[in-house]
């Protein structure tokens, strides 16, 4: 089978598509024919050795997929050969076949296509966990989303609207802000031409926002934290800007602000029941037409490396989906 392979930690450019042996599932595992796999920012980090998890070399990147079960390992009871499934696998999705721990695989909701299934899990799962489980977003509150045209940001906009919140989307270009408005943002901030804190003050009558969802980090973290209201919550979701920011902790003290970390991947492992409940909620919203992943591009396996590079350079809006068999 063909797979995009990382043979040593380093630049994304060294990734190559190789012919490799088709793996067999072990006990508690399933092998999936990958029909669609989505590109996410952690893919860029993991191949450079910069992510929290470092797979044994060589490996294929790709954290989420949709496909069809082709083989079932010993002890697997809830999945059958031929079943359409989705999986948050962590790595291994950019390949024609993937062997995955069966506990990380769930049946695909009725009416969902492969591309949507692949694009839903990580970004929407992260955003729902962040806003509901960690941040406890309430109806009527105002949420500021940084990096709002990325996968997590767009998902956060849609989910926050379903939760009854007002959404302010911040992004770095007018094209990105236009997309944010299309998916439901109430207000937008062009944070390369506007002062983030001043604009938030103007949009909230000087009160600040109750919550910030930040998958970006970098230079906008401190002004966004300063723009939170009394007892506001700041969700640390990721560091797409590259730099991990350092902020004065007196900012937390002054308005009793809470700085909350969001590690969805580990939360899935620690509380699978909560993860399943969130997936069921996402599936229901999708079936009702309330959420819809923005898929900006589809590429074959030979285009996956370039897609990861563009993701790292923050040149992607929404999600890029890889079709390994194209």
PLM segments and residue spans:
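Glycine-rich phosphate-binding loop and adjacent beta-alpha segment
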Residues: 219-291, 323-326
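Short amphipathic alpha-helix with an adjacent loop that forms part of the alpha/beta core around
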Residues: 195-206
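NAD(P)H dinucleotide-binding glycine-rich loop of Rossmann-like/cofactor-binding domains
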Residues: 33, 45, 84-147, 182
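Mid-domain Rossmann-like dinucleotide-binding core that forms the NAD(H)/NADP(H) cofactor-binding site
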Residues: 80, 118-194
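Short glycine-centered segments of the SAM/dcSAM-binding site in methyltransferase folds
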Residues: 84, 142, 166, 232-233, ...
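Glycine-rich beta-strand-centered segment in the early N-terminal region that forms part
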Residues: 21-38, 50-92
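Short, glycine/polar-rich helix-capping loops at beta-to-alpha or helix-loop-helix junctions
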Residues: 93-96, 171-179, 244-249
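C-terminal capping/lid region of NAD(P)-dependent oxidoreductase domains
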Residues: 283, 288-297, 305-326
């Amino acid at each position: 089978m063909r797979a995009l392979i990382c043979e040593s930690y380093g630049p994304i450019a060294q990734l190559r598509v190789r012919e490799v042996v088709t793996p067999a599932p072990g006990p508690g595992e399933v092998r999936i024919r990958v029909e669609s796999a989505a590109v996410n920012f952690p893919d860029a980090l993991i191949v450079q050795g910069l992510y929290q998890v470092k797979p044994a070399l060589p490996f294929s990147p790709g954290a989420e997929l949709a496909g069809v079960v082709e083989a079932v390992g010993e002890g697997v009871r809830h999945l059958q050969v031929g079943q359409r499934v989705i999986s948050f696998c962590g790595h291994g999705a950019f390949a024609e076949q993937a062997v995955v721990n069966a506990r990380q695989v769930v049946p695909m909701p009725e009416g969902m296509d492969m591309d949507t299934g692949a694009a839903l899990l990580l970004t929407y799962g992260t955003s729902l966990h962040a806003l509901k489980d960690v941040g406890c977003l309430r109806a009527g509150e105002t949420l500021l989303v940084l990096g709002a045209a990325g996968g997590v940001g767009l998902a956060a906009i849609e989910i926050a609207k379903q939760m009854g919140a007002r959404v302010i989307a911040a992004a770095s270009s007018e094209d990105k802000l236009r997309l944010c408005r299309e998916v439901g943002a109430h207000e937008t901030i062009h944070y390369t031409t506007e002062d983030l804190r001043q604009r938030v003050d103007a949009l909230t009558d000087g009160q600040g926002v109750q919550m910030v969802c930040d998958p970006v980090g970098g230079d906008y973290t401190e002004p966004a934290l300063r723009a939170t209201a009394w007892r506001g919550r700041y969700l640390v979701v990721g560091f797409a800007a590259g730099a991990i920011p350092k902020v004065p902790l007196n900012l937390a003290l002054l308005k009793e602000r809470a700085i909350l970390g969001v590690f969805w991947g580990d939360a899935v492992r620690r509380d699978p029941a909560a993860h399943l409940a969130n997936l069921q909620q996402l599936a229901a919203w999708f079936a009702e037409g309330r959420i819809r992943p923005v898929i900006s591009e589809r590429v074959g396996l030979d285009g996956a490396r370039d897609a990861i590079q563009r993701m790292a350079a923050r040149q992607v809006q929404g999600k890029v989906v890889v079709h390994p068999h194209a």
